[in-house]
């Protein structure tokens, strides 16, 4: 009696090829995990400017952080950027109030999620007040559910994350294109300018608040003449794009007879996107005072002239505001004329 035995033959060549391919992919993946892509390093380089140290973000812990949404556009940009930076520094998830989203989202491509009011009301928040400058204690803020308060708007909070902050405050395409189309149409004595300087003149309530409350001044005609002349001496045929919440005053006090000044802003504080976009799309900035001008200069990059020393030494404003924390070290200050305050 013969026994029948059946043999199964596995194809040798395909099997060896499969093992070789799988081994190659596995070891390649292991090597890639140990390498940092060069584009990541390049993207981080701008964020290292002018900051003494780069704090490492902690692993994200449980809980959530938010911040008060108070003030107009410049204030809320400062609040957003501060929340973004401090939450990351402390390893917490960050959420913004709906009011902040309504202010910023129509203009910028922000990414922080919204914490709706119904949810926020059920959270046991711990309020944590911030000064308008970075302090060491803010690196170790206790609490899982923290609501940051105050009016923080200082590069000392977030400049180590400059590349990320610029990404958060990227203009929507239609906002940017409208501003760029306007700028492309400008001419200086018939020629297209090669250098665009945004000029923001803060007037409005500050005209009365600064002298009567803060023992300070707003920018005058002489300051603006000096600032414009600084750029005229440095660049060939620049054009100055003026935005203000006091455009009538600007037309009366800024000399446009050379043909290099354009009064472009609408001064509408309720819809600031157009004015802000125009300023950020310029190469350089002249600002006076206020967070609107500070942020326009920060996003534009380039060279910035600002009004310096615009309060008396005993001003109560200096208890809540540090000029060195508001203006980047590389920006150039022109001292204000305080003589009107000394006449009283």
From Swiss-Prot:
Q: Outline what the protein does.
A: Catalyzes the transfer of L-fucose, from a guanosine diphosphate-beta-L-fucose, to the terminal galactose on both O- and N-linked glycans chains of cell surface glycoproteins and glycolipids and the resulting epitope regulates several processes such as cell-cell interaction including host-microbe interaction, cell surface expression and cell proliferation. Preferentially fucosylates gangliosides GA1 and GM1 in the antrum, cecum and colon and in the female reproductive organs.
Q: Which UniProt keywords apply?
A: Glycoprotein, Glycosyltransferase, Golgi apparatus, Lipid metabolism, Membrane, Signal-anchor, Transferase, Transmembrane, Transmembrane helix
Query: Among its keywords, does the record have Glycosyltransferase?
Result: yes
Residue spans, topological domain Cytoplasmic: 1-7
| Reaction catalysed by this enzyme | a beta-D-galactosyl-(1->3)-N-acetyl-beta-D-glucosaminyl derivative + GDP-beta-L-fucose = an alpha-L-Fuc-(1->2)-beta-D-Gal-(1->3)-beta-D-GlcNAc derivative + GDP + H(+); a beta-D-galactosyl-(1->4)-N-acetyl-beta-D-glucosaminyl derivative + GDP-beta-L-fucose = an alpha-L-Fuc-(1->2)-beta-D-Gal-(1->4)-beta-D-GlcNAc derivative + GDP + H(+); a ganglioside GM1 + GDP-beta-L-fucose = a ganglioside Fuc-GM1 + GDP + H(+); a neolactoside nLc4Cer + GDP-beta-L-fucose = a neolactoside IV(2)-alpha-Fuc-nLc4Cer + GDP + H(+)
Gene assigned in the entry: FUT2
- The membrane-spanning stretches of this chain are 8-28
> What does the record say about its membrane topology?
Single-pass type II membrane protein
Task: Note whether Glycosyltransferase occurs among the keywords.
Answer: yes
GO terms for cellular component: Golgi cisterna membrane
Q: Which organism is it from?
A: Bos taurus
Which protein are we looking at?
A: Galactoside alpha-(1,2)-fucosyltransferase 2
Q: In which tissues is it expressed?
A: Expressed in brain, heart, lung, intestin and kidney.
Q: Where in the sequence does glycosylation occur per the annotation?
A: 189, 255, 283, 309
The protein's predominant localisation is Golgi
């Amino acid at each position: 009696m013969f026994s029948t035995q059946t043999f199964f033959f596995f194809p040798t060549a395909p099997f060896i090829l499969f093992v070789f391919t799988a081994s190659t992919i596995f070891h390649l993946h292991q090597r890639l995990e140990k390498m940092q892509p060069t584009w990541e390093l390049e993207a981080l380089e701008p964020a290292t400017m002018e900051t003494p140290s780069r704090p490492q973000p902690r692993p994200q812990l449980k809980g959530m952080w938010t911040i008060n949404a108070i003030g107009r556009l410049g204030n809320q940009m400062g609040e957003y950027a501060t929340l973004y930076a401090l939450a990351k520094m402390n390893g917490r998830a960050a959420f913004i109030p709906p009011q902040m989203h309504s202010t910023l989202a129509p203009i910028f491509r922000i990414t922080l999620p919204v914490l709706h009011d119904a949810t926020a009301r059920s959270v046991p928040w711990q309020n944590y007040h911030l000064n308008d400058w970075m302090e060491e204690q803010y690196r170790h803020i206790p609490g899982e559910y923290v609501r940051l308060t105050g009016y923080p708007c200082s590069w000392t909070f977030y400049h180590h994350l400059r590349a990320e902050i610029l990404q958060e405050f990227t203009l929507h395409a239609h906002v940017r294109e409208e501003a760029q189309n306007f700028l492309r149409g400008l001419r200086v004595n018939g020629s297209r300018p090669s250098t665009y300087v945004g000029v923001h003149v803060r007037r409005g309530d500050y005209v009365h608040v600064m002298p009567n409350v803060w023992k300070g001044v707003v920018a005058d005609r002489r300051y603006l003449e000096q600032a414009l002349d600084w750029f005229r001496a440095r660049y060939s045929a620049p054009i100055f794009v003026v935005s203000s919440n006091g455009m009538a005053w600007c037309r009366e006090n800024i000399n446009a007879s050379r043909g290099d000044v354009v009064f472009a802003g609408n001064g509408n504080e309720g819809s600031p996107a157009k004015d802000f976009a125009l300023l950020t799309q310029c190469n350089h900035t002249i600002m006076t005072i206020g967070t609107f001008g500070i942020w326009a200069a920060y996003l534009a990059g380039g060279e910035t002239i600002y009004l310096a020393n615009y309060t008396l030494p005993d001003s109560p404003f200096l208890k809540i505001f540090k000029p060195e924390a508001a203006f980047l070290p590389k920006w150039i200050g022109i001292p204000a004329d305080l003589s009107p305050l000394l006449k009283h």
